[in-house]
Amino acid sequence: MVLLFWISKQKAGEPMSERKTQQELDFERKHEEDLQRIRDFRLIDDDFMAAVFEDHDCAEFLLRIILKRDDLVVREVRGQYSIKNLQGRSVRLDILAVDRNNRAYNIEVQRSDRGASEKRARYNSSLLDANLTDSGEEYDALNETYVIFITENDILRAGLPIYHIDRTVQETGMIFNDQAHIIYVNSQIKDETALGKLMHDFFCTDSRKMYYPILANRVWYFKENEKGVATMCRAMEKMRDETAAEQNIKTLLVSVKNLMKNMNLSPEQAMDAMGISEDDRKMLLQRI
């Protein structure tokens, strides 16, 4: 009787050896969600944009169109590049490129207006100055820099496809040639110009609908090629881990500050009481 009951249960479901654990089911669900996200990615999405334009030729192509300079040659390019601010905390840039004349380009895509404010542009410009020169170098050694925001909305609200910002002398109108440039690209304008077609491509989820083959091929690689898809999946897993780690630090920071306030402790004493690891201590001390 027991044997018949066991056999009937086995027929009703999968063999025990083939049943999946909850962990395996969760992994498959998460993987399928990642694949769907990859299918929906566009170049206006910063993580995907960073992966595509980390390619040397794609970055060079992008800059040539935005700056209207066919002579521009990129020497090196990095995606999701971390640099330090004055407090020693890491700030991640979508793209950092340097050309053969040592000009530096920070390219950011921003879907929210707040992330592309005027002071954010100034902040990024200062980060480039602080990180691209060695200690003790003369100010004349500063790189010429470009901070380029590609924005989902028309941040400056003048209906133009592109805005160039340079310091000027108010009394004369002359350019103050500090060689620190800021550019806003309005992705709302998708006309038949080279820049308009580029902005069209920034909103395509399907590489077959893109104007520029050099970008379409790179988008296809990350969406359709097995190796490219695997690369994006690993990148997304890394982002999840980093997000979880950042949330953990924020939670610890609140607890440490509360303990310091309520018990009148120093940061070190509060972290000792909480048994915080050495790695987490270093990160917390930068923020307290």
Indicate residue ranges for each PLM-predicted region.
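Accessory alpha/beta interaction modules
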Residues: 2-178, 191-193
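Pocket-edge structural micro-motifs
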Residues: 149-152, 186-187, 223
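Low-complexity, glycine/alanine/valine/leucine- and proline-rich hydrophobic stretches
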Residues: 169-178, 183-188, 198, 202-205
